[in-house]
Amino acid sequence: MQQIHRLERKLLRATAEAIRDFDLVSQGDRIMVAVSGGKDSYTLLHLLMRLRERAPIDFDLVAVNLDQGQPGFPAHVVEDHLRSLGVPYRMLQRDTYSVVRRLVPEGKTTCPVCSRLRRGVLYNAAVEMGCTKIALGHHRDDLVETLLLSALYSGALKSMPPKLRSRDGRNVVIRPLCYAAEEDVAAFAEAMRFPIVPCDLCGSQPNLRRKRVKRLLAELSAEHPAVKGNLLHALGHVVPSHLLDRDLHRQLADATGRDPWLDAEDEEAEDCGEPAGDGVVSLGGARGGR
């Protein structure tokens, strides 16, 4: 029980700080919490329910689970849990599984197509239900892995933003767990004995690139525990004058009347091995350390 309280306090603090730093929740919001049956979404729902009890503003939560027609998906497991919480919920059924099987060649990972179809269903449901925000359970490790995946395989410096507006302009997506470490989320979900539904019921091949990046981060973290925190910290501490983005350089030059590259300090890359710092960085910063 003591472990549960310790983990809950830590996760509540991280979630509250992310909500405050990025203005994720507003007075009167009706937030759809996408609950897949995994550790991340269960934890997110629990934390938002706890924060709502003590928040200085009023907002509503509605949990939504989507049965995509995967063979053996135990929708009753998720529904029983949601019912036990007393939270308003809605169970959706859309057969996107057959669509994915038709579109994706055998042996290829189905996750990207499946994710896009699921997102479309949730977006439409949010509008129908009058929800102002959609909360997803992506945590710190997801953001850091995505940063490396984008840089290594797509040649772009980007990750998952803490909030965004959908392309059709109808929905705002928020990620309140963006400061929370996966290890803390996993430990909390296990301690709470959430009824986890496996995510591989469809038989999909895993995202091998993401698994490789996850292994790389695990190896680096074993040598230097602050690696993941430092990478998240880097997402909130961009130094444009030390990058090669010409469009960004032009925008800064037009705004300031100065050449950012000529104003850059002459710094050599140093392998100091020191953490960037702990705690929360304000003004859209990120948490350093673990």
From Swiss-Prot:
Highest rank taxon of the organism: Bacteria
Cofactor(s) needed by this chain: Mg(2+); [4Fe-4S] cluster
Xref: Gene3D superfamilies: HUPs
EC number: 2.8.1.-
Coiled-coil zones: none
GO biological processes: tRNA modification
Keywords, in A-Z order: 4Fe-4S, ATP-binding, Cytoplasm, Iron, Iron-sulfur, Magnesium, Metal-binding, Nucleotide-binding, RNA-binding, Transferase, tRNA processing, tRNA-binding
Function comment: Catalyzes the ATP-dependent 2-thiolation of cytidine in position 32 of tRNA, to form 2-thiocytidine (s(2)C32). The sulfur atoms are provided by the cysteine/cysteine desulfurase (IscS) system.
Name of this protein: tRNA-cytidine(32) 2-sulfurtransferase
